[in-house]
Structure formats: C-alpha cells, structure tokens
C-alpha cells in the first residue's frame, strides 16, 4: 500500500438483499464469461463491470471498468476510467494486475510504484 485514505464509507444506499445479490451475480457472471480470458490468471475471485462512454463518431470511446474482490467478502474495489481506451473490457487486464499485486505478498517492496505514478 502506497497511501491509505479514509476507509469509512461517505454514504450508503438502501438496497434490498435480493437486488444486491442480482448485481453481484451479474458482475461475477461477467468475470466468468466475457472477461474470463482476462481473469484466468487472477489470484482472487472477483466481480466486475465494464462501461463504454461514447464521445463522437470520429473518436475512440472512453473506457470504464470497476471490480471488487474477493467476491464473497469484498476487501478492495478498483475503478479505472481512461479516455479513448475504446471499451471498458480493454481495461480488465490492468485491473487484474492491480488485484494480483494487492493480494500477492511481495517481499521486495522496493518495486512499489509511488503515488500518482503509472503502473508498469
């Protein structure tokens, strides 16, 4: 962990257990289906959702990707938004790299990238 902010939720929403379960199952289905090539090497179970923000016909779309892990007892959420990334699925491999780095003990912390730095 390079930097740790406030871990308390800023607010909450009122959602039924049934609706929350449906959302989580949909996010798990995406990881096990369309995104399975990206999550094949993920060290932890996860739920994810892709998004694409269309801009104009003559430019690439913006990509959005969110995920959480572990699936059964979430500990971390990752959100990525990149201009002109074409589609949210294009960001899945970056999210998997973040999850793997977070959940894999690393004895050599000298390779940790500092805050506000691009990941390798």
Please state what every model-predicted region is.
Residues 1-35, 39, 104-120:
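Conserved active-site-proximal loop/helix segments of enzymes involved in bacterial cell-wall
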Residues 19, 91, 95:
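Hydrophobic (often cysteine-bearing) scaffold residues that line and stabilize catalytic clefts
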Residues 23, 49-51, 66, 78, ...:
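Residue-level preference for non-acidic, small/hydrophobic
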Residues 40-70:
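Short, Gly/Ser/Thr-enriched beta-strand-loop segments that form substrate-interacting elements
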Residues 94-102:
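Short amphipathic C-terminal alpha-helix that caps PH/PH-like domains
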Residues 74-84:
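Short, well-ordered beta-strand elements
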Residues 57-60, 79, 89-92:
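Short conserved micro-motifs at the rims of enzyme active sites and ligand-binding pockets
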Residues 15, 83-91:
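Short alpha-helix boundary/capping segments
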């Amino acid at each position: 962990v390079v930097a740790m902010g406030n871990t308390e939720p800023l607010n909450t929403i009122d959602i039924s257990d049934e609706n929350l379960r449906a959302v989580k199952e949909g996010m798990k289905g995406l990881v096990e289906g369309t995104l399975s090539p990206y999550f094949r090497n993920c060290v932890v179970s996860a739920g994810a959702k892709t998004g694409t923000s269309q801009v104009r016909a003559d430019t690439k779309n913006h990509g959005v990707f969110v995920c959480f892990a572990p699936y059964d007892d979430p500990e971390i959420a990752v959100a990525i938004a990149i201009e002109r990334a074409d589609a949210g699925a294009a960001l899945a491999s970056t999210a998997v790299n973040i999850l793997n780095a977070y959940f894999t003990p690393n004895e050599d912390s000298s390779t940790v990238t500092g805050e506000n730095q691009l990941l390798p």
